């Protein structure tokens, strides 16, 4: 690889090129506020059910409580994740990940790369899995997970998720201490694009957000999501679940909910997440699981009545 250090946008292009060759569909960032790439429907919804799936995409991820007014060198209201989800998981997925780092110029012989066991979960969305944090030269840069549950439902097929923290990967590659000193591309600094929005979003989240409005919106988003799910409209419903989740995160950052109330809000989001995951599988079953090419397996999962049948250790459930 050339000595010139990759700009932020070139890191994205390199990862897109690498993972598309491994069978991942290159998706675009989902156009709704999410706290992580996992919450995109390209991961959350598609990880359940028997259909194979592969996707890779950049996802801007908003975490209001992590805002630091643009003053912290690596903690942000909004950061960027490069998300890879492969179902079923390739047996050599860890090897592929290391190859992707090599494509970025991060040689395992020249850098300290460690897989630190870290079983991951997202309680509010009912997601959990076994996996590792990947540390490069002393900082966490990637989360590597084999999903066990999504939306509170046990997955049918082992699904692997790789979440690159792009800002942290970029600081390793460009050898800078602050994300704001990164080159985004064409000589433009990361800070020239994102430092002002970081300050403004932090000020909004911690000082200026309208708590009464947010409380009202959460309830309205929740009701709309549940109404849409009753009508079998999975994707519009999921949009409102994401809005509910982000609204809760804004309330939490503002200190507008107590510890007890916080648990209650998380339970409400988790209830919606479980319902949308279940409904998504049911709707895909009505279509005959079109991405499932194995006819015998399709028939097994659809059962005798053409409805989704959970398979557990070779038996129907």
From Swiss-Prot:
Location (main, coarse) = cytoplasm
Q: What is its EC number?
A: 6.1.1.14
Q: What sections of the protein cross the membrane?
A: none
Give the record's GO biological process terms. glycyl-tRNA aminoacylation
**Cell location:** Cytoplasm
Gene3D superfamilies given in the database record? Bira Bifunctional Protein, Domain 2, Class II aaRS and biotin synthetases, domain 2
Q: Name one GO cellular component term.
A: cytosol
Q: Return the similarity comment.
A: Belongs to the class-II aminoacyl-tRNA synthetase family.
Question: Which HAMAP family does its entry note?
Answer: Gly_tRNA_synth_alpha (MF_00254)
Protein name, as recorded: Glycine--tRNA ligase alpha subunit
Classification from the root reads:
Bacteria, Bacillati, Bacillota, Bacilli, Lactobacillales
């Amino acid at each position: 690889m050339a000595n010139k250090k990759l700009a932020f946008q070139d890191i994205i292009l390199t990862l897109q090129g690498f993972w598309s060759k491994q069978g991942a569909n290159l998706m675009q960032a989902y156009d709704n506020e999410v706290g992580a790439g996992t919450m995109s429907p390209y991961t959350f919804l598609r990880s359940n059910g028997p259909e194979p799936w592969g996707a890779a995409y950049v996802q801007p991820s908003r975490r209001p409580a992590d805002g630091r007014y643009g003053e912290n060198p690596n903690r942000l209201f909004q950061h960027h994740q490069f998300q890879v989800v492969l179902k079923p998981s390739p047996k050599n997925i860890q090897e592929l990940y290391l190859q992707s780092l090599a494509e970025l110029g991060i040689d395992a012989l020249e850098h300290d790369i460690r897989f630190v066991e870290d079983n991951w979960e997202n309680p509010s969305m009912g997601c959990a899995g076994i996996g590792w944090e990947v540390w490069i030269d002393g900082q966490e840069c990637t989360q590597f997970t084999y999903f066990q549950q999504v939306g509170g439902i046990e997955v049918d097929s082992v699904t692997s998720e790789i979440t690159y923290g792009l800002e942290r990967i970029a600081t390793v590659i460009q050898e800078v201490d602050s994300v704001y000193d990164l080159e985004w591309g064409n000589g433009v600094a990361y800070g020239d694009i994102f430092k002002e929005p970081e300050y403004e979003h932090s000020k909004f989240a911690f000082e200026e957000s309208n708590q009464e409005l947010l409380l009202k919106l959460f309830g309205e988003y929740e009701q709309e999501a549940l109404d849409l799910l009753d009508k079998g409209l999975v994707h519009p419903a999921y949009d409102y679940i994401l809005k509910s989740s982000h609204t809760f995160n804004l309330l939490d950052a503002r200190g507008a909910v107590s510890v007890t109330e916080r648990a209650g809000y998380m339970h409400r989001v988790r209830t919606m997440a479980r319902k949308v995951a279940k409904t998504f599988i049911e709707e895909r079953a009505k279509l005959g699981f079109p991405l499932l090419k194995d006819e015998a397996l399709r028939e097994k999962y659809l059962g005798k009545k053409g409805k989704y049948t959970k398979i557990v250790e070779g038996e129907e459930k």
